[in-house]
A protein has these predicted regions:
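C-terminal helix-coil-helix/basic helical segment that borders enzyme active sites and/or dimer interfaces
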Residues: 23, 27-31, 293-330, 343-351
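Glycine-rich phosphate/cofactor-binding loops in nucleotide/flavin-utilizing enzymes
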Residues: 346-396
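Glycine-rich beta->alpha junctions and the first turn(s) of the following alpha-helix
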Residues: 196-292
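Charged, amphipathic alpha-helical oligomerization/scaffolding segments
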Residues: 17, 251, 258, 287, ...
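Short, structured patches in soluble enzyme cores that scaffold and shape functional sites
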Residues: 128, 139, 154-157, 172-175, ...
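A short core secondary-structure module
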Residues: 142-183, 193
Length: 396
């Protein structure tokens, strides 16, 4: 099925329509520890994995900010499912940077195909071989891997001495080439199914090994001529946090809506007083709202800016890229702090597993541990660059 004629507004309508069902199934998703097959089916039917797939392959090819808005909307219902939509959906976008032959190989067979990933460059080792690379490694946190037929694995390629890095590749490999190791017993984001992946001495042809240094912005990557639209001129590594951090926005929003709805009618267990009349509660609600609004503004500002740079055929400088990565990290921090504020005034009901607030809280805590959302790391990078220091990342 083609979704090439689906507009941004229609995609958002479809996402909103999915939220009640995702919320209803959120506990089942957590219990299963994977993207539920019925949720996958629901999202396939709505086309919501294909918002950034090139139109020539039947995708929506929506502006970059759609990945923030769609994922955040879905996360109001189930953050784990939304995380997988952002993660698996953005791989349709990244595949658009690969050689045309590889794009056709994957999408001609199945335009709905799901592609997992693990972006830990240090986890994969590669060496140069004739017409490609020989790759080995074990990668953690491959979200949605059980639902996927392919996997994009980050690999550091070493020179003849086996010690000197000479290249950084994102290798797309079929599921027949890797082993899934079930390590995913987590306290939050449980339904993402983010298991380990292992490969041993597999050959990856050049056309399936995307050079990340060619994807730092602009059309000069292998897929640039096939997909000339602005979406495919956005720097991959600099913007890679957006598909995932959007989940934090929606999780915080879902928690906020749940708490406000509860407080409008809830009475204190011991006093019988209306909770909504307590000034301390009112202040916490306002604090949470402002933190969520701040997080949304940070994320949308940088997402829109990435799209605008690309539309003008411009590439943001390193300082700007690092500032936008810091936006990601601070947005997730603000989202987590918002839910912490809600949690602090919600009372003992928050500890029941039947109450969605505890799952939103655990999910935000788990998300905050992601490398990309560590503000000390992201902030140090931007602070170094803006004050004239040297920041080295050959893939940025």
């Amino acid at each position: 099925m083609s979704f090439a004629d689906v507009s941004y507004d229609e995609a958002m309508r479809r996402a909103r329509e999915c939220v009640p069902t995702l919320l209803e199934r959120a506990q089942k998703c957590e219990d299963a520890r994977v993207l539920l097959p019925e949720n996958e089916k629901l999202l396939h039917e709505a086309g919501l994995f294909r918002f950034h797939q090139p139109r020539r392959f039947g995708g929506m090819e929506l502006p970059f900010q759609a990945i923030v808005d769609i994922v955040a909307e879905l996360a109001r219902g189930c953050p784990s499912t939304a995380w997988n939509v952002g993660n698996l959906g953005c791989h349709h976008w990244i595949l658009g940077y690969y050689e045309p032959e590889t794009q056709h190989e994957v999408w001609d067979a199945n335009p709905d195909v799901l592609i997992a990933s693990s972006i830990a460059l240090a986890a994969g080792r590669g060496r140069i071989a004739k017409d490609g690379f020989v790759v080995s490694g074990r990668w953690p946190f491959s979200s949605g891997v059980d639902n996927s037929d392919w996997n994009m694995l980050a690999v550091t390629v070493y020179g003849d001495d086996g010690k000197t890095p000479v290249d950084w590749r994102l290798c797309i490999v079929p599921k027949t080439d890797y082993r899934v190791i079930d390590t995913w017993y987590a306290m939050g984001m449980v339904g993402t199914g983010s298991k380990d992946i292992e490969v041993k001495e597999i050959f990856v042809p050049e056309r399936r090994a995307l050079a990340l240094k060619l994807c730092r912005g602009g059309p000069g990557h292998p897929g640039g001529k096939l997909n000339p639209g602005p979406l495919f001129r956005i720097p991959i590594v600099a913007s890679a946090g957006h598909p995932l951090s959007a989940t934090a926005l929606g999780a915080a929003e879902g928690a906020f809506q749940h708490v406000v709805k509860s407080f409008k009618t809830r009475l204190g267990t011991y006093t019988g007083a209306k909770i909504a009349d307590f000034q301390a509660v009112q202040i916490k609600i306002a604090e949470a709202r402002c933190l969520i609004d701040s997080a949304i503004a940070l994320m949308r500002d940088s997402a829109v800016a990435f799209q605008e740079f690309a539309q003008k055929n411009q590439v943001p400088d390193l300082e700007t890229k690092l500032r936008f990565r810091a936006h990601n990290a601070l947005a997730v921090r603000h989202a987590r702090q918002a839910v912490e504020a809600l949690w602090s005034c919600y009372g003992a009901n928050a500890i029941y597993t039947r109450d969605p607030l505890q799952r939103f809280m655990r999910d935000l805590q788990a998300m905050s541990q992601h490398f990309s959302f560590n503000f000390d790391i992201a902030g140090a990078g931007y602070g170094t660059a803006v004050m004239g220091g040297t920041y080295v990342n050959p893939t940025m």
